[in-house]
Design a protein with these regions (language model features):
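Active-site core segment of subtilase-fold serine proteases
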Residues: 1-62, 66-67, 71-102, 106-109, ...
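Gly/Ser-rich catalytic serine loop of serine hydrolases
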Residues: 27-36, 70, 137, 141, ...
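Extracytoplasmic/secreted envelope proteins and their assembly/folding machinery
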Residues: 35, 39-42, 72, 76-79, ...
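C-terminal subdomain of the subtilisin-like protease fold in secreted/lumenal serine endopeptidases
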Residues: 63, 90-107, 113, 118, ...
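A cross-family glycoside hydrolase active-site/sugar-binding cleft signature
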Residues: 64-65, 103-108, 135-139, 164-165, ...
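Active-site environment of divalent metal-dependent phosphoester hydrolases
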Residues: 112, 141-146
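Anion (oxyanion) recognition and catalysis
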Residues: 125-128, 184
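Extracellular S/T/G-rich loop segment that most often corresponds to the catalytic His/Ser-adjacent loop
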Residues: 132, 150-224
Length: 261
């Protein structure tokens, strides 16, 4: 029940009706900013009259505001919320919590050494264990992330999918790394939601990242009883299956072989 100052669902968060803000410890996640652009790439609703649609056009979105700043502790705190919700879903057979299948991080630290953030990187393995894949936007700078470093896309966890940006001709710009960045996705001159009522054309790995997260969600929507039985009985195996389909199903482009895994 929104606004009653009670943790009705027993997940440890009071009145988390709209998501969670880790800085203010409430569900004031904000509207109309960079996050709105990213959310449109994931799941702008189909037939919305705005001439834009997300990769998954009929999906529920969990919004997080990392109000504590970009520190290792605040990042782990933010990721703990979807983890708790997915754990509840797993343990209750879907009666409680939320069926979180992917997170999207259109933020990070350019040039950061992953070895300096061990808890942050290791947390992706924890999320993956419970069935959550995680997507990260690599730097927009023309840097070899394998050499320069990047967070979070420099983390070696299988459950952190590093994504670069590509254009309509499958050319790329910005960060790359054939040991670190899994693949590229559309993120150059893409159209997405903006503000509270409009759309915009924009560029950045920030938009390739949520597009990928939306595709992960779409994969889970495929009506396949055997797959859902696997997801319920072994969430990690379900995530592994989607990850394998995603990484082996990309178009291998000659101009990208030296840029991405």
């Amino acid at each position: 029940i929104d606004g009653n100052n009670i943790d009705d669902d027993g997940n440890g968060y009071i009145d988390d009706y709209n998501g969670w803000n880790t800085g203010s410890n409430n569900d004031n996640t904000g509207t109309g900013g960079h996050g709105t652009n990213c959310l449109g790439m994931i799941g702008a609703r189909g037939d919305n009259g705005l001439n834009v649609v997300g990769a998954n056009w009929d999906v529920k979105l969990m919004v997080l505001n990392m109000g504590g700043g970009l520190t290792q502790s605040s990042v782990v705190q933010a990721y703990t919320y979807p983890l708790v919700m997915r754990q509840q879903w797993n343990q209750s057979g879907g009666a409680q919590g939320a069926f979180v299948v992917a997170t999207s991080a259109s933020w990070g630290i350019d040039g950061a050494n992953p070895n300096s953030y061990p808890l942050w990187c290791q947390f992706y393995d924890t999320l993956g264990h419970y069935g959550i894949l995680n997507v990260g936007a690599t730097t927009n700078q023309n840097l070899d992330v394998d050499v320069a470093g990047d967070m979070p896309t420099g983390c070696t966890s299988d459950y952190m999918i590093g994504v670069g940006r590509t254009d309509n001709d499958d050319n790329t710009a910005g960060g790359y790394g054939d040991q670190t960045i899994n693949f590229g996705a559309p993120g150059i001159s893409v159209v997405t939601t903006s503000g509270t009522t409009s759309i915009t054309t924009t560029t950045g790995t920030s938009f390739a990242c949520p597009l990928t997260a939306g595709v992960i969600g779409l994969a889970y929507s495929v009506p396949c009883n055997d797959f859902m039985d696997l997801v319920i009985s072994d969430p990690k195996a379900g995530a592994d299956a989607v990850l394998a389909a995603l990484t082996t199903g990309v178009d291998a482009k000659p101009q990208l072989t030296s840029r991405f895994i």
